[in-house]
C-alpha cells in the first residue's frame, strides 16, 4: 500500500485495454476483398486443412480470416464481410468471414446453428 506522498510523486498508471481485433477499427464488421484463398494446418495436437483467406479490408489492413463451415465458394476478388473472433489452433488468424452475406454463400444442408452459417430454414 503506497503512502499518500508516494502517490503524489508518481500517480497510478491507468490500465490500458488493447483491442483483440485492431483491423476492424472499433466497427462490428468490415467489408473486404479476398486476395488469396488457401488452406493451412493447425497447431500441434490437431491435424486438418483449415480454410482461410487473406482479405484486404476497407480500413486498409490486410488480414487472415477463417472461413467457417463445410464447403465454400470464395475465390480471389470475392467481396466478404469480416468479423472479429480468433481461431485457437491457427496462429495469426484473428478474424472470421461472415457466411451468407455479400459474395459468401451460406452452408448447404445445415439444420442446427443455422444463423451462424447463413443457412436458410429447410422447407
Swiss-Prot record:
Protein task: With S4 and S5 plays an important role in translational accuracy. Located at the interface of the 30S and 50S subunits.
InterPro entries, A to Z: NA-bd_OB-fold (IPR012340), Ribosomal_uS12 (IPR006032), Ribosomal_uS12_bac (IPR005679)
Protein name (record): Small ribosomal subunit protein uS12c
CDD domains membership: Ribosomal_S12
Subcellular location: Plastid, Chloroplast
Similarity annotation: Belongs to the universal ribosomal protein uS12 family.
Signal sequence interval, chain numbering: none
Domain of life: Eukaryota
A Gene Ontology molecular function term of the record: structural constituent of ribosome
Origin species: Chaetosphaeridium globosum
Principal location: plastid
Coiled coil stretches, renumbered: none
SUPFAM superfamilies from the UniProt entry: Nucleic acid-binding proteins
Alphabetical UniProt keywords: Chloroplast, Plastid, Ribonucleoprotein, Ribosomal protein, RNA-binding, rRNA-binding
One term under GO cellular component: chloroplast
Single biological process term from Gene Ontology: translation
UniProt lineage: Eukaryota, Viridiplantae, Streptophyta, Coleochaetophyceae, Coleochaetales
Subunit structure: Part of the 30S ribosomal subunit.
Amino acid at each position: 500500500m503506497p503512502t499518500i506522498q508516494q502517490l503524489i510523486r508518481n500517480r497510478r498508471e491507468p490500465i490500458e485495454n488493447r483491442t483483440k481485433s485492431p483491423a476492424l477499427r472499433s466497427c462490428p464488421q468490415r467489408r473486404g476483398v479476398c486476395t488469396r484463398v488457401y488452406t493451412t494446418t493447425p497447431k500441434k495436437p490437431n491435424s486438418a486443412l483449415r480454410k482461410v483467406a487473406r482479405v484486404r479490408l476497407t480500413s486498409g489492413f490486410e488480414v487472415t480470416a477463417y472461413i467457417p463451415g463445410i464447403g465454400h465458394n470464395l475465390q480471389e476478388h470475392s467481396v466478404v464481410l469480416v468479423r472479429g473472433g480468433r481461431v485457437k489452433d491457427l496462429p495469426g488468424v484473428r478474424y472470421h468471414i461472415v457466411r451468407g452475406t455479400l459474395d459468401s454463400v451460406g452452408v448447404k444442408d445445415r439444420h442446427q446453428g443455422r444463423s451462424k452459417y447463413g443457412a436458410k430454414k429447410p422447407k
